[in-house]
Design a protein with these regions (language model features):
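Surface-exposed coil loops of outer-membrane beta-barrel proteins
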Residues: 1-69, 76-88, 109-122
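Detector for outer-membrane/organellar transmembrane beta-barrel domains
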Residues: 59, 69-72, 76-178
Length: 178
């Protein structure tokens, strides 16, 4: 769900803390009917991992992500799955539960939204960047104007052991004292 479609004024704290924006890459999604009224919707992406449609120097590696949604009561009307409020006033209960996973190889920003704001170096001044893993689960229920939304996200980083220096925002290099 995009933060611009939230019912409340504030952007989702989860999106603000964990989401990268405007990824550039390959995206694939589909919808499969699995029974009389239930569907699954898988999504997969391989992106640059730095967000914000990076056109300059792209630090780090690729980001691999996937998501799967299960809709046991059928599809939402008029893409209602992607908006927080039940603007369509669903006449029958609608529910979606989804799980997501992403792995960013060599992240150069605290959440992968700008290239090069975090740069670490080894003794030979080669970039050594942490890998970033994120996974979560969420749900959305709507019925006759009522909507209920919940989500859980967990994130972690694997930091390489050879890091000895970092580049500050002003371009100067500092050495770690361990």
């Amino acid at each position: 769900m995009r933060s611009s479609t939230l019912q409340l004024v504030e952007r989702s704290p989860v999106s603000a803390a964990f989401a990268s924006v405007r990824e550039f890459g390959f995206f694939a999604e589909s919808t499969y009917k699995v029974s009389k009224q239930s569907y699954i919707k898988p999504e997969f992406a391989i992106t640059n991992g730095d967000g914000l449609n990076v056109f300059g120097k792209d630090h780090g590696g690729l980001k691999y992500g996937g998501r799967i949604d299960y809709l046991p009561f059928g599809l939402f009307n008029n893409f209602g799955q992607y908006r927080q409020a039940d603007l369509e006033r669903e006449l029958t209960p609608k529910f979606v539960i989804g799980a997501n996973y992403s792995y960013n190889v060599g992240i150069s920003d605290r959440r992968g939204s700008q290239s090069g704001t975090i740069l670490y170096l080894d003794n030979q001044n080669n970039e050594l960047l942490p890998d970033y893993l994120k996974y979560g689960i969420d749900f959305l229920f709507k019925y006759r104007g009522f909507s209920l939304l919940g989500e859980y996200v967990n994130a972690s980083a694997r930091v390489p052991s050879g890091i000895t220096k970092y580049i500050r925002d002003n371009g100067s290099i500092d050495t770690f004292v361990l």
